[in-house]
Structures are given as structure tokens and as C-alpha cells.
């Protein structure tokens, strides 16, 4: 993979440029003409500067209103991204990440920011060229703004807009990959020279006479109109990102050129924003801030004076010792910070606010200051938390407080890995991978109930399909990557959504794509063995220790049979697992021929796997017919697909939980182990498997890691699966029919004495309060939404659920 980057830069504006809370409008509020014809507005750019290379540009449009209208709806987009100001007020940023055939625009009513008389729309637009993030598509630097009707056409982008390139910005931290010695594709940080910045450029009284007239490129176009398929303007599918002010928990360490320096300690009220911190001229100061928890946020540094100073901000998930080990994340002794960094050069002005247009990820943030001939005043330092606005609508309470810690930490992990798309991790990649997303989507639906980001992800992957029929493994991504098993997980995601949401039209549209994915695999089945033969690309399954990184092929996590001549039992059963779900979908949507085809295919795949890979002496499924490698993964999918006879499945799961001779699953694949435990009646053992999560908490992690130490990423939402399983396994709430129209609730208490909580359902809230009575008894109540019924099961006894039901076994 080649290192392309998306840079993050800092927009500087006066204190009046604070962030406003605003909601994007939905597609049904858009003028229908704009959905079905070319826009009057033109894409615009700078007339002479390079529009392909790194650059930051400011655009302005002055206009006059005789009176303030009740509504003033505009639609805005940019390449790469924009931040919009109206009369000096920061209004919104975007567009949401998509691809060239789905270039999203934002629809907003800006009437609340307008005034009678002179008004100005101002937008900063940036393009990071070759340094852009891998998740960012681009054509060239451009902006488009379209009024919703004739009343708003006055602000349409055309040659009347003005533009200037901002010379204050240069990319920084281009060596982050080498510094951290790992894969990073979120782009460079920013070197900002405040003396070159056009202060107050976003305000109405700014003089833009020296700015250039914008150059027009082409009219905005929508899908199906004309022949163009780039910058296809598409209404935003997700809400605005949440933004909330947050402050640092502590200053953990300071050092200065002179240990006795009086300024070395932060003033008592500084972290609360109540006192300034003055750094004298010609001094050096290093300050280590601790957020207390990992966060994704826009740091906001407010300073005055300090001309000739230099400020570095270094961001890290954790500190490391001399050997590169993270150890306990709370400990800082004999540890240093390594991470990407921003650089600021103050101009001596007052009230200068430095804020990135894209967020940073950190728990620890180190500020390094070197002042020049003028003292530097730190007026304030805080941050603006930003993530997808998932609400924690579910509640899960028990008599074991450590489960509350796992719940809270898992939810933080899920939140930091959800933005304009789901992220695998917020620090290193910010890419949406199918294997991660399946778990993240279930967490979102069970804990929040918000399905918009889930729907967006399902569409993203369907839109990623390339000519061979497979979906890409991650999307949006300007660097294409193919992991064939992830195309299968996309099918599983569609099936998950079908069981949890009553949206048949949305689901049915994916069936042709499912057929394409499965046809790709069918063509690669070995007719001699019935197993999957050689399958191209990266057949990732899990980051198991035995499945090492292959530097020649540049792949890892691949089981035996996944990267040579095929015959992998795991990959074959993953195919069978997806085919079984495809058969159910085709049955439901009245495609009997296709459904029967998939049922027979699933039968053939499982029979071939058992015939070729079952080792009678070991009583395990081998990873290949050679029977010289055995993994927990193969047994898990042997159970999930019924490749292993049903009467042997429970015994199998009991064995693999303790047999360390097998290749072991990481945090990611333990999600599938849990599903196998549920299937075999061993859900009561689930809480016994949470040791790795408790170990992470003991190591001071505030989010769950990519894998157990040593790990690259401290925040990976595929490891937040307990937030789903506390509700789906411990509380035992699962759909009993498509669309979640009926439920099945079979709690698995393990060693708990009571569980209490609630879970969002499309029709309302499922509420439960249950307590064990002695060894076998259970009492309490379950409340379902009005139009939902279900079955409650306890130790082979059952009762119908309807409205409020008293439980007494």
C-alpha cells in the first residue's frame, strides 16, 4: 500500500467565529428540480493557482437583503472539504465522505444567521492533493453553492464569487509513518504561519478587493442527467456530526529550560478556562496534557502575543517506553510521546484561535513552546469533541460493577470509531472496513437504535463493487483493496439488517449485488474437492499470531489454504455461512430458483468441508485437507454452518474454549465465538470469556484495542462487541422474525444475580428487570412496545410476551 495522506489544517478566526448548532435538511425538503436537472450554480475554483496540489482557499460572496426571510435554504459541497461561515458565524462543515459517483452535498437553512443589509457567505476549502487521506476522493479544488429556489439564487456560485489562496499553510508531520513505524493514512498535520493569515476573512467588514474573481468549471449535475459520472451531486445521507466542548483532565508533566522557572506550573484555573498561562520571552516549555480518556476532537488553542514563538502540538493514544512498549496507559514515568504534530507560529496578535478543520485523536497531547522576543499568553486550551451523534439509548445494569466498566469503555470505543463513516480506528486509518462494520452496525442498532450510519455503510459497500463482482474491503477509499471474505460479511450485514429493520425495498435492492459476490466465489470452487480453490487478493480472517505478516505478498492474518492453492476449510465455511443467509433472503423476497440454488450450494460446501477436513483422531476440523493445522476459527464456523453435526456442536465449543493447542482467535474473532456459544446453548458461559477485556481495563485503556498487547491501535470498535452481546446474549434479546416484528428473549445470566435495562426497538423501547431466584428460578418483568410480541425462554420453559409481562419461573 502506498502512503497517500489527507492533511489536516487549522483555520484561524476571531472569537466571534464560534461553532453554531445547525441541522442538515433531509432530501424531501430539497427542491425537486435540483434532484432532477442540472443546477444553475457552477463549480468554482481559483483562476490561476494549482487546483490539483495541496492548497487552502478562502471563498467569499457579498450580497444584500432588504429584509431577513423566514427561510433561506442553500445546498453546498466542495472538493476536498469546506467549512462555511455566514456573517462571521461558523455554520457547518462537510461534505460527508463519498465517492465521485456519490458526491454528497449539505442542505441547510441559514436564515437565522442573516440580517437586513449587507451579508457575506464565506467558505474555506482545502485540497491535500497527493497527501489526502485514503478515505478521500478528489478531482480538483472546487466549491459549489446552490440556492433552493429563485429566492436564494443570489448566492449561487459563479464568477461573482471571490477567492484567495491562503499562504499561511504548509503540510507537517509527513514523516509520521516513519516516526511511529506503522501504517498511517490520515494525512499530514499543519504548519501554520499566522503572520500570513488573512484575519477576519469571514466577516462582513473584511476588504476583499484584492482577491481574484473565481473561475467557473461546470454546472452541478445530478444522477441520470447528462453523461457525467464525476461529482454526481447526492443529498447527504447522515446527520451533522456531534460537537461538544470538553476540557483536559490534567497536566501530567511539565519541563522548562530552567527547572526553577516560575512559569513551569500551569495556573490553577487554566484547565478550567479561568486563568491565563503566560510564558515569558526567550523560554522553552513542554507540557503533557492528559484528556483522561481517548477522544476525537478539534483542539482549540486561544493565544495572544508571542510573536516569534513556535508551538508544537503532538498527539498520541498512549506513551511508550524506550523499547516502544505502551504498558499501563495511565503511567507516564520513563515514557515519551510519539505521534503526529501540528506547528503554529504566532503573529503577535490578540485572541488568535487555532482549530483544525479535521479532528485529531489523542489521550495525551504534548505542547512544546519556544518563545521569541515577546511573551506568549495562553488564553485558553480546550477541545471540541466530534463524532457521529450516536445516542446511548440502551441501558444495561447488573450486580457486577466491572461489567459497567466494559459497557462504558466499549461504548466510547464504538463512538470514536463512528464519524462520517464507520472507522476501523480513529488514529491511524479512519477507513471503513466490512469486517469491522458488521460488528459496529450491530452495536449501533442495539445500543442507539439509529440506523442511518448502518444504511450508509451498506450502500457504501454496494457502491464499491468493481468489475469482478466483489465489493471492496473498505470504502470509501481512493486506494482500492479487496478482501474476498469481507464481501461475504457484507452479505451477512444485509441479512442482519433484514432481521432488525422492516425495510424490504431497501434490502431487496441488494440482491443483485449479493448474486454477483457469490458468483465470484462459485467460479472458484474446486470441482475435485468441493472446497474453495485458489482465491485471489487478501483472504484475511483474523490477526492470529500463527498467521504472520508476509512481507513478500504484503498480507497477514491469512489461514493455511488462503494464499496458495486454496482448499481452506475456514474460507469455504465462511462462504457457506453467507450462502445460507442469501438463501433466506431469496426465500423471503420470492426468488425460489435462486433460493434453492443457494440452499443446495450451502449443503455441498459444508459436506465437502466435513469430508475433506474432519480429522477423526483429533475430532477437529482441520484448516485444510492436509490436516496439519487446526484453529478455533474452523471449529467456530463448523458450528455456525452446521458443518459439524448438531449433536456434536456443544461438546466442540466446550473443548475449544480451553484447548490452547489450537490457533486462537483475537478480540475481533471472539465475536463469532460468542455466536457459536449461543447457538450451542452455552450462552451462560459468555461472561467467563471476558478476561481479555478486563485485562485491557487493568492496563489503563479507556477504549478497547485492535488486539491484546502488543497492539498498534488502542481504539478498534470490532473489540467493542460486548456492548452488543450484553443485550443480545446476556439479556438474550434477538429478532424472531424479519424486521424485528417479533422478538425472542432468552437471558443467559451466568454468575449474575440480576439484569436490568432497556434496548431501543423500531417501535419503541424494550424494558427488562429480571432477578434470579435460587439456583433455577427467575422473576421480574419485560415490557415490549405496543405492536411487538415475542417469546421469553428460561431453562426450556417459555411464556408469551405482549405489552407488560410478569416473569415468574
Regions found by a protein language model. Give the residues of each.
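Aromatic- and histidine-enriched alpha-helix N-cap/loop-to-helix transition segments
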Residues: 79, 360, 428-436, 449, ...
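Heptad-repeat amphipathic alpha-helical coiled-coil interaction surface used
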Residues: 491, 498, 576, 582-583, ...
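C-terminal capping/lid segments that line or modulate ligand- or cofactor-binding pockets
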Residues: 186-188, 192, 429, 447, ...
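Bacterial Sec-dependent N-terminal signal peptides
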Residues: 1-23
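Active-site acid/base region of carbohydrate-active enzymes
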Residues: 156-166, 172, 364, 372-409, ...
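Alpha-helical support elements that line or immediately flank enzyme active sites
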Residues: 298-317, 365-368, 434-464, 494-501, ...
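Non-catalytic C-terminal accessory modules of carbohydrate-active enzymes
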Residues: 175-200, 265, 600, 607, ...
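Extracellular/oxidizing-compartment recognition motifs
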Residues: 21-427, 436, 452-453, 457, ...
Amino acid at each position: 500500500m502506498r502512503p497517500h495522506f489527507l492533511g489536516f489544517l487549522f483555520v484561524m478566526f476571531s472569537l466571534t467565529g464560534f461553532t453554531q448548532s445547525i441541522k442538515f435538511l433531509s432530501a424531501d425538503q430539497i427542491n425537486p428540480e435540483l434532484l432532477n436537472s442540472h443546477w444553475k450554480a457552477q463549480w468554482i475554483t481559483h483562476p490561476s493557482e494549482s487546483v490539483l496540489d495541496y492548497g487552502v482557499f478562502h471563498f467569499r460572496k457579498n450580497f444584500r437583503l432588504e429584509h431577513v426571510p423566514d427561510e433561506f435554504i442553500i445546498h453546498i459541497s466542495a472538493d476536498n472539504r469546506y467549512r462555511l461561515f455566514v456573517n462571521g458565524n461558523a455554520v457547518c462543515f462537510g461534505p460527508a465522505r463519498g465517492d465521485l459517483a456519490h458526491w454528497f452535498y449539505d442542505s441547510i437553512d441559514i436564515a437565522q444567521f442573516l440580517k437586513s443589509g449587507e451579508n457575506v457567505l464565506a467558505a474555506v476549502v482545502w485540497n491535500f492533493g497527493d497527501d489526502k487521506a485514503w478515505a478521500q476522493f478528489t478531482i480538483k479544488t472546487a466549491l459549489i453553492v446552490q440556492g433552493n429556489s429563485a429566492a436564494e439564487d443570489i448566492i449561487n456560485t459563479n464568477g461573482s464569487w471571490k477567492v484567495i489562496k491562503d499562504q499561511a499553510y504548509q503540510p507537517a508531520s509527513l514523516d509520521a509513518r516513519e516516526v511511529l513505524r506503522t501504517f498511517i493514512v490520515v494525512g499530514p498535520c499543519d504548519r501554520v504561519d499566522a503572520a500570513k493569515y488573512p484575519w477576519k476573512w469571514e466577516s462582513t467588514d473584511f476588504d476583499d478587493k484584492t482577491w481574484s474573481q473565481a473561475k467557473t468549471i461546470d454546472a452541478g449535475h445530478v444522477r441520470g442527467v447528462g453523461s457525467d459520472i464525476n461529482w454526481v451531486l447526492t443529498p447527504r445521507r447522515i446527520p451533522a456530526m456531534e460537537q461538544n466542548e470538553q476540557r483536559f483532565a490534567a497536566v501530567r508533566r511539565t519541563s522548562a529550560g530552567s527547572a526553577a522557572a516560575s512559569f513551569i506550573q500551569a495556573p490553577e484555573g487554566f484547565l478550567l478556562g479561568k486563568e491565563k498561562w503566560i510564558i515569558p520571552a526567550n523560554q522553552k516549555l513542554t507540557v503533557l496534557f492528559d484528556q483522561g480518556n481517548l477522544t476525537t476532537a478539534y483542539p482549540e488553542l486561544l493565544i495572544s502575543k508571542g510573536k516569534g514563538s513556535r508551538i508544537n502540538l503532538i498527539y498520541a493514544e498512549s506513551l511508550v517506553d524506550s523499547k516502544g512498549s505502551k504498558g499501563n496507559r495511565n503511567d507516564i514515568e520513563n515514557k515519551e510521546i510519539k505521534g503526529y504534530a501540528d506547528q503554529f507560529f504566532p503573529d503577535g496578535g490578540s485572541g488568535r484561535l487555532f482549530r483544525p478543520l479535521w479532528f485529531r485523536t489523542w489521550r495525551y497531547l504534548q505542547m512544546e513552546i519556544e518563545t521569541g522576543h515577546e511573551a506568549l499568553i495562553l488564553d485558553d486550551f480546550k477541545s471540541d469533541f466530534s463524532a457521529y451523534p450516536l445516542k446511548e439509548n440502551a441501558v444495561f445494569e447488573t450486580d457486577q460493577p466491572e461489567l459497567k466498566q466494559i459497557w462504558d469503555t466499549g461504548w466510547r470505543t464504538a463512538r470514536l470509531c463512528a464519524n462520517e463513516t464507520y472507522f476501523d480506528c480513529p488514529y491511524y486509518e479512519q477507513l471503513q472496513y466490512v469486517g469491522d462494520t458488521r460488528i459496529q452496525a450491530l452495536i449501533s442498532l442495539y445500543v442507539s437504535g439509529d440506523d442511518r450510519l448502518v444504511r450508509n455503510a451498506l450502500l457504501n459497500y454496494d457502491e464499491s463493487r468493481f468489475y469482478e463482482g466483489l465489493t471492496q474491503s473498505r470504502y470509501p477509499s481512493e486506494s482500492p483493496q479487496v478482501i474476498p471474505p469481507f464481501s461475504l460479511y457484507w452479505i451477512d450485514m444485509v441479512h442482519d439488517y433484514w432481521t432488525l429493520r422492516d425495510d424490504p425495498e431497501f434490502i431487496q435492492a441488494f440482491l443483485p449485488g449479493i448474486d454477483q459476490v457469490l458468483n465470484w466465489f462459485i467460479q472458484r470452487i474446486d470441482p475435485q474437492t468441493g472446497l474453495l480453490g485458489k482465491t485471489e487478493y487478501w483472504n484475511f480472517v483474523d490477526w492470529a499470531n500463527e498467521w504472520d505478516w508476509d512481507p513478500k505478498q504484503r498480507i497477514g492474518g491469512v489461514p493455511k489454504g488462503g494464499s496458495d492453492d486454496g482448499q481452506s476449510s475456514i474460507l469455504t465455511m465462511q462462504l457457506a455461512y453467507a450462502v445460507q443467509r442469501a438463501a433466506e433472503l431469496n426465500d423471503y423476497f420470492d426468488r425460489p430458483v435462486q433460493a434453492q440454488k443457494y440452499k443446495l450450494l450451502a449443503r455441498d460446501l459444508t459436506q465437502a468441508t466435513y469430508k475433506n477436513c474432519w480429522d477423526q483422531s483429533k475430532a477437529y476440523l482441520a484448516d485444510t485437507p492436509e490436516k496439519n493445522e487446526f484453529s478455533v476459527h474452523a471449529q467456530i464456523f463448523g458450528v455456525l454452518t452446521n458443518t459439524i453435526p448438531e449433536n456434536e456442536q456443544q461438546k466442540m465449543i466446550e473443548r475449544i474454549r480451553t484447548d490452547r493447542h489450537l490457533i486462537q482467535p483475537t478480540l475481533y474473532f471472539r465475536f463469532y465465538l460468542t455466536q457459536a456459544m449461543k447457538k450451542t446453548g452455552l450462552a451462560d458461559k459468555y461472561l467467563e470469556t471476558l478476561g481479555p477485556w478486563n485485562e485491557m481495563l487493568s492496563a489503563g485503556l479507556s477504549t478497547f484495542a485492535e488486539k491484546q498487547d502488543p497492539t498498534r491501535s488502542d481504539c478498534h470498535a470490532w473489540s467493542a462487541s460486548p456492548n452488543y452481546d450484553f443485550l443480545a446474549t446476556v439479556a438474550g434479546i434477538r429478532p424472531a422474525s424479519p424486521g424485528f416484528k417479533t422478538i425472542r428473549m432468552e437471558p443467559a445470566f451466568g454468575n449474575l444475580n440480576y439484569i436490568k435495562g432497556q434496548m431501543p426497538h423500531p417501535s419503541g423501547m424494550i424494558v427488562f428487570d429480571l432477578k434470579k431466584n435460587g439456583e433455577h428460578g427467575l422473576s421480574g418483568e419485560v415490557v415490549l412496545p405496543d405492536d411487538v410480541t415475542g417469546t421469553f425462554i428460561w431453562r426450556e420453559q417459555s411464556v408469551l410476551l405482549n405489552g407488560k409481562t410478569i416473569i415468574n419461573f
